[in-house]
From Swiss-Prot:
Name of the protein this chain belongs to: Tol-Pal system protein TolB
GO cellular component, as recorded: periplasmic space
Keywords, alphabetical: Cell cycle, Cell division, Periplasm, Signal
Keyword GTP-binding on entry: no
Gene giving rise to this polypeptide: tolB
GO biological process: cell division; protein import
């Protein structure tokens, strides 16, 4: 009997000792773990952050419906980023909503949430609402930040995108691209011709509309730095002209008309100048700067080669462009006066459509080699060149405001049963997280706006 008791006590002591060791190790891990709110996230990471977006508290039916719509947009934004993994509301344990209480963090930990979003919506007058939201770090049981936005009812989608941007920024330390727009060329077929119209939409495909009527051939639309104008090339009677469309007033006017073929217009970062390419002589193309304040036109490139596709650096002091001056089509960099020209890329292959990243560390490009097209990025010193998108005809890269995401178009060959399809895709500059951006019709020549206020 004594021996049995001794054995039992020994087992109990072993169990107690094991529990003590587990608790000690757990506390040690917790003491040396950095909270989520201070982790720097990169899009190349495969592990997504589980996030619970609670329904925002609301009193009236109108506020309740708005709450559901806003939470749905926030969840969709964060989900497509592939950084976050929104948790289904069916799994939520805590039922209390709003921003006035401290969450029951154990309940959120039970469903493996690392980040919790609580909020409330209040109607403040006949047209306006106020939304307040709090970002909680469930792991550390601490508030990361809280903010409020006042908005008219028609801007609820934009407000939801703003909240998603704030969540992305405060958790990852990087800018989000959710409250942005995309302009592109939409192409459809009529009975006897292709109809090309400039279209604009939110980054998630919502609020889609056309800003040209399809009567004239249009190419290469770009946003102004303040997002209030679209610059593009329109062909009237087969003559190309650079036009500018005011998104606020709807006014549309010719900005510049040269002899020969004019294409590839680009705004300067301050919006006061534009660059265009013009070919008035056979096999010779030059880059011109147009001062929008004075109307003065300045030729930046010289010689008897093709110089085209200019792209300003973020500070406007340098310009990336394409030239065949070395015998093959390569990307060069010059200063904003046309001097100090340096070659960036080298063979094999031809390099076109340079796009300078807003963070000033990479230039995106289209590469053509042996009939194959690809999208890539390269550092400003010519190092770290890598291909991030391929398949048939990919072209026209444009950077999102975060300097990490690139949009481009991809054409699919026609088959016996299908016509040629041209679609828009976005991809991280590391080559991760490629996704299709839905458009009603064929789409090409995309350009990403800056962040909307």
């Amino acid at each position: 009997m004594i021996n049995n008791l001794s054995v039992s006590m020994t087992k109990v002591l072993k169990i107690i000792l094991t529990i003590i060791i587990i608790l000690f190790n757990t506390l040690s891990i917790l003491a040396n773990t950095t909270t989520l709110s201070s982790i720097k996230i990169t899009k190349g990471n495969c592990t997504q952050i589980p996030i619970a977006i609670n329904f925002f508290s609301a009193k009236s039916n109108e506020e309740h419906d708005l709450s559901q719509n806003i939470v749905s947009i926030i969840s969709n934004d964060l989900n497509i980023s592939k950084i976050f993994a929104p948790i289904s509301s069916d799994l939520f344990i805590e039922t209390e909503q709003g921003v006035a209480h401290i969450p029951l963090f154990t309940a959120w930990s039970q469903i493996n949430a690392n980040i919790l979003i609580n909020g409330e919506i209040t109607k403040i007058d006949s047209t306006d609402f106020k939304v307040t939201f709090v970002i909680w770090d469930v792991f550390s049981a601490k508030e990361i930040t809280r903010k409020s936005f006042t908005f008219p009812s028609q801007l609820w989608r934009s407000t939801a995108h703003k909240i998603a941007d704030q969540i992305y920024k405060h958790v990852t330390g990087s800018k989000g691209n959710f409250n942005t727009k995309i302009v592109y060329v939409s192409e459809s077929n009529s009975s006897n011709r292709k109809i090309r119209r400039i279209a604009i939409m939110d980054q998630d495909g919502a609020n889609h509309n056309y800003i040209t009527n399809g009567k004239n051939h249009v190419i290469t639309p770009v946003f102004s730095p303040k997002n209030n104008q679209i610059l593009y090339v329109s062909y009237h009677n087969k003559i190309p002209t650079v036009r500018i469309h005011d998104l606020n007033s709807g006014n549309n006017k010719i900005l510049a008309s040269f002899n020969g073929i004019t294409f590839s217009p680009r705004f300067s970062p301050d919006g006061n100048k534009i660059l265009v390419s013009n070919s008035s002589t056979k096999n010779v193309t030059h880059i011109y700067e147009i001062n929008l304040l004075t109307g003065k036109i300045k030729q930046l490139t010289k010689g008897q080669s093709i110089n085209t596709s200019p792209s300003y650096s973020p500070d406007g002091s340098k310009i990336a462009f394409v030239s065949d001056r070395s015998g093959s089509t390569q990307i060069y960099i010059m200063n904003d006066q046309g001097g100090n020209i340096k070659r960036l890329t080298s063979q094999p292959g031809a390099y076109t459509t340079p796009a300078w990243s807003p963070t000033n560390n990479y230039i995106a490009f289209t590469k053509i080699e042996a009939g194959e097209f690809s999208i890539g990025v390269i550092k400003l010193d010519g190092s770290n060149k890598r291909i991030i998108a391929t398949k048939y005809l990919v072209e026209g890269p444009s950077w999102a405001p975060d300097g990490k995401t690139i949009i481009f178009s991809r054409a699919y060959k026609a088959t016996k049963s299908t016509s040629t399809k041209v679609k828009l895709y976005s991809v991280d500059y590391t080559g991760y997280n490629e996704r299709e951006i839905q458009t009603p019709e064929n789409a090409s020549d995309p350009n990403w706006s800056n962040e909307y206020e």
